[in-house]
Amino acid sequence: MINETAYLLGSNRSCIRELFEYGRQRAQEVGAQNVYDYSLGNPSIPAPPEVNAAIRQLLEDTDSLQLHGYTTAVGDLPAREAIAQDLNARFSAGVRPEDLFITCGAAPGLTAVCKALTFPGAKILAFAPYFPEYKPFVEAAGAQFGVVEADVPAFQICRSTLEAVLTPDVAAVIVNSPNNPSGVVYSRQTLTDLADLLTRKGEEFGHPIYIISDEPYRELAYDGVEVPFLPLIYPHTLVCYSYSKSLSLPGERIGYVYVPQSAADSAKVYAAVAGAARAMGHVCAPSLLQKVIARCASVRPDLEAYDRNRRTLYEGLAAMGYEVAKPEGAFYLFVKAPGGDAMAFSEKAKKKDLLLVPGNDFGCPGYFRICYCVSHAMIQKSLPVFRQLLAE
């Protein structure tokens, strides 16, 4: 006998991974230069030089046993001190090292936080469009996954739509800004309205409704747009952060959970996060990477290449007549599928070796996602294909 839920998760790849694997196969058949693969959000700019320098210096100067040995489960103190110092310098947030739990990227942090906040019969909501893996994360934690219908075409948060689905069994809502897949950044007004609503409903229900703020794209914002730090707007916010995108380290798996003192029962929540991580098999985040973050927590990415790609694609597609949500952050565009059927449009594009992820798994069936963390040359070469598809 096996676990049927686990079997289904393992045997059915996500639409993103399936398209990515197809792209790799097609690249072998027709040449990588002839495949326009916009499927996967894999950073295309190198890690900052400070990161590579830190790795080299650590390998040369640090005793091997110390460098590769176990750390504490919550993470090395120097790493947590560096993260707290960086957050306080930027946001005056009052972060303490003991409020931080170092994780193997954002995904296990999200799962641990969901588990920590789940009570019998609990529901955790996400705003469409949302990252598809939220559903298995929430369900693995033992909660029910609920979706708040998308606010199209702005893709902000519609207060009335959320209020209609807020019930006493809602433990938390997941907020992802800058957003994957839309590239939209939630405005300060949007987040203030959200905080006001959750405060009022929490008082009505007799328990706080937490926000789980998923922030892997926090540093990826353009045109000077503000990315508000949610714990300063809503006290019951838990932050899940990853350095995968900001430092181009997706394969190294390093991030953190921040449980602010302002959150209800913060000490218990922190302990519950630690316990949930333990039950998931967490021992510690990679020791070498923790030491890198201790030196590089304040390093920022060079966004010039992403911004150039963003402008080229957004302006090019909009000029052709595509309806596109203006991308202010991350490295995604979310485009309305001509004809309204994203699956059919993506299949048609696939026949031209243009790989676009339909929005069905993101909770928005009529849209498709473009990841523009690719070469600028590929973008320029693919634009005529987008024009052909629109004309057909």
What are the roles of these predicted feature ranges?
Residues Q66-L67:
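Pre-Walker A segment
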Residues T62:
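Conserved AdoMet
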Residues M1-L19, A27-L59, V74, P78, ...:
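PLP-dependent class I/II
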